[in-house]
Amino acid sequence: MSDLMSDLVSEAPLRLAVIIGSVREGRFGPVVARWFAEQAQQHGAFTVDVIDLADTPLPLELPPVPPALEPDMVRPDGMAGLTRRLGAADAVVVVTPEYNRSFPASLKAAVDWHYTQWQAKPVGFVGYSGGSGGILAMEQLRQVFGELHAHTLRDVVSFPRYYLLFDQDGTLKEPEGPAGAAKVMLDRLLWWGSVLRDARRERPFAAQL
């Protein structure tokens, strides 16, 4: 580990929100999220909060006034916990499947009901699907989070044909490659998360609408 990374790790841990983007019955997201959360905990620089969108009612109907114009808006019952946890995060990792070359509606609803909670924070992606490993969903999410003034990371973790990669108990059959990719992304999250956390403390982010 470089001296810079050692210094960053020695600082106060970054609060990392790991979001399970799918709420579909029979989804595989919790298995992937659990694996990634373990990687983040072993990294040593993060406190990890796994956010399962299945635990929060996410209406697809958006408010008449968008959150960008009314950040402190009253949100639907049951969403307060999600809003608080997103706001507290210093960095975010989205675990997403790929449905019809895109990401789930549940994830889009969670994103669109919030605005300031994403600003000036790094966002990483862990994707899983059939042949593409969620790459198409992750590329679309880059555009969405860029619009919300988040910084998306170049490095991702991808699980193509995920159903062949994990055992019945959710253990990766060959963990070395994915673990290496996760470490690269977590190192990037640590750098960006630390720098942007300091920046938000010194000069709160103000987007020009």
Give the predicted meaning of each segment.
Residues A12-V18, P122, P160-D169:
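A short small-residue
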Residues D49-L62, L148-D169:
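Mobile beta-alpha loop/short-helix "lid" or hinge segments that flank ligand
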Residues M1-A109, L172-K183, D187-L190, L196-L209:
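N-terminal beta1-alpha1-beta2 submodule of the flavodoxin-like/Rossmannoid cofactor-binding fold
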Residues L107-Q119:
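A short, gly/pro- and small-residue-rich
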Residues P66, D112-Y115, G146-A150, S194:
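A generic structural signal for secondary-structure junctions
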Residues A40-A45, T116-Q117, H149-A150:
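Short helix-capping segments at alpha-helix termini
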